[in-house]
Amino acid sequence: MKNLQESYTESELKDLAGKGIFGSKGSDGYLLIKTNFGEGEKVIAYADLNNDKYTDIITYKQEKNSIYFYSYTYDHNQYIFNKSEVLFILNSTLDNPIVKNVIVNSFIKTSISPDFLISISNDDKNKYETHLFYKNKNKDEYLYKNLNINSNIVVADINGDRNMEIIFFKDNMRQIFYFGDEYSKDGTIKSFDEILSSKDKEGASNYKFLNKKFSDKYGNAFVDLNGDCLPDLILTSEEDQILYLEIYYHTEEKYNLDSYSFKIGEYGAFLIGDFDRNSQLDILFPHLNEPKVTIFYNQFQSNHNWDENYCEIIKNNNDVKEKKYKKVFNEFFLNDSKTYKTIDLIKNNSQNYTFYGKETLIRAGDFGSTGIPGLLAIFKTNETNNKNKIIKLFEFEKDKITEVDLKLDTYLEKMDIQYATFFDFAEDGRLDLIIQGKDKIISIWNNNSPDKFFIKNKIVLKKGKFSTLEFGTSFRYVVTDNEGLRSDNVVAQMPQTSGMIIPLPFAYQGIGRSNNYIEHLYAISTSFDKVSNDIISVNKDSFTPIIPNTQLIITKGYEKEKVKWEIELVVTPTENLLILLIVIIIILFIILFIIIFLHSKERNEDKEQDSDNFRAWFA
């Protein structure tokens, strides 16, 4: 088998994507694998449509306005994605429609499979349509509903009641659309300010947030930022060349507002991750005009006593100290190296590189399993010998950042790269790459650092015969590394909320080269209390110890409104498992031989002793 480090002819390179698998397990590095994505298709979402616990890939072909899905199967060491027939056709009244956002989750209670919420805009992004596709028990085909939402959207389970809410902008105000427990054909709409506390409703009005469009260019999210185990809502908005970062902290009853503002021309869409490995989520912004990123470090006090009740400890500490929820990031531009750090990604000739596009073209993922998310970025280059877009990987480890050479530049230069994202093709806990060209998709298998360990988790909500990813959940682990240092790490499970982000459909945490047991793994989610009707309760479970290279799948169901967790552990063996088993068997045989030898020797000595005693008796 060839890989891209070896030579290919021009015709072979041209036809490389689309069939079978390339690369051998004996090769280290990043290898191109052939996949059967159709020409002109684009990856738009991940989902488990057939409820087999594997992740399927959703694609869209604009030429035919068709949505397809590729179901994952494993057959004789081959990882195959079987293409479906057309799931449904998109019909839009817009000129030159562009699919902006695809969210596969549960919106209608009577659906018998995951629903598709699709946001479409035109080239100028001044017109939007929002389409919902769903199945009910009467028909096995997708039904269509136009939600009459003509703005960009953000989706989250804001109330924690297992019903997805859609935040949108209409009539110069922010509104929330949802279907609720009792399915209404037209849904229900309420004002965005209803989720805010009285004080913060006033604060949001003063900032004019409530009548300001939120942006899909700079990112939105639904994650726990302040460590109290309740997911917080992050929105971005822009006005007069100022970018506003709005953070709505989730208390047990309402949301409290915190906001920051800075010049809009400096940054692109933000990323979230634990970039300093202190069990708190930080925010990273790429610079638009230079190959740099700035990480704003979470300023909440980390809890390093590894107590099972750390959520309550953090919440109580902040309540006692300030009688309110402390600001996470203090001020964005304090002259304090502990608050933020700007990192040069490209050291040499950096003036020739800029990030490609403002939106979603940089990704975070721990592809090196170091315990800190790395970066996948697309750059435009002004070098005379290469004016195309190029892809680079950057790995964080402790206090340094390293560029990882894909060794695929010769091939990738021939593509008109549109975007790139992470995926786990082989379900083996390695973050592979999907690279979207203008007319085709290529896939790159990560066979780097096989001696590093990971844990891969997800919480899904059981809805009848299918399940969907839960919003606002997080995972936290505690581990001791090979140097004897104890550390903790947090990662958020972030299903798609807005924009063409295509986030990972699971929470992935690298462990590095520590092959010790994971001492504690905490899985955290929230539930709606039907009795009080508006109180969020925290569901938290601790697993100890956990073997590295494990996938934890938690299926969260409800019986009589009580939460029921079903746990599945899938252990991914290391590449050297066979050798390890052979060595163990050989050692066991050696031990068995020694035991038999010693036992035989002892029996012979006993016989000789008995013979001597017998002769002595008669003598």
Where are these regions (language model features)?
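Beta-propeller blade repeat segments, especially FG-GAP/WD-type strand-to-loop junctions
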Residues: 1-30, 65-88, 127-143, 173-199, ...
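Gly/Ser/Thr/Pro-enriched helix-cap/hinge segments flanking short amphipathic alpha-helices
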Residues: 2, 11-14, 19, 255, ...
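Repeat-based blade/solenoid architectures
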Residues: 32-44, 88-104, 144-154, 199-221, ...
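Structural signature of eukaryotic scaffold interfaces centered on beta-propeller domains
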Residues: 45-51, 102-111, 154-160, 221-227, ...
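Acidic/hydrophobic-patterned starts of short beta strands in beta-sheet-rich repeat architectures
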Residues: 51-61, 109-119, 160-169, 227-236, ...
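Short, structured coil/turn linkers that connect adjacent secondary-structure elements
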Residues: 61, 72, 119-121, 135, ...
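A generic tandem-repeat structural signature
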Residues: 68, 78-157, 162-167
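Beta-propeller domains
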Residues: 212-252, 262-397, 414, 418
